[in-house]
């Protein structure tokens, strides 16, 4: 497993602190949609990395 970039960790941690109830423990697709709604990130790759990081941290 690769080490996540700093911006993925920082953004993921901020989102988990502010919107804890918006994310699911095991559902990557739900977390991906939540990241899309809560941020203005346009890059699909970055959005998926952040959603994957949040899913990993919630488990």
Swiss-Prot record:
Family of this protein: Belongs to the eukaryotic ribosomal protein eS17 family.
The name this protein goes by in its record: Small ribosomal subunit protein eS17
Protein's GO biological process: translation
Taxonomic superkingdom: Archaea
Lineage of producing organism: Archaea, Methanobacteriati, Methanobacteriota, Stenosarchaea group, Halobacteria
Xref: InterPro entries: Ribosomal_eS17, Ribosomal_eS17_CS, Ribosomal_eS17_sf
Coiled coil: none
NCBIfam families: PRK01151.1
């Amino acid at each position: 497993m690769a080490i996540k970039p700093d911006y993925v960790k920082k953004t993921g941690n901020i989102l988990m602190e502010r919107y804890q109830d918006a994310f699911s423990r095991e559902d990557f697709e739900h977390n991906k949609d939540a990241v899309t709604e809560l941020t203005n990130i346009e890059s699909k790759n970055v959005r998926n990395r952040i959603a994957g990081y949040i899913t990993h941290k919630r488990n």
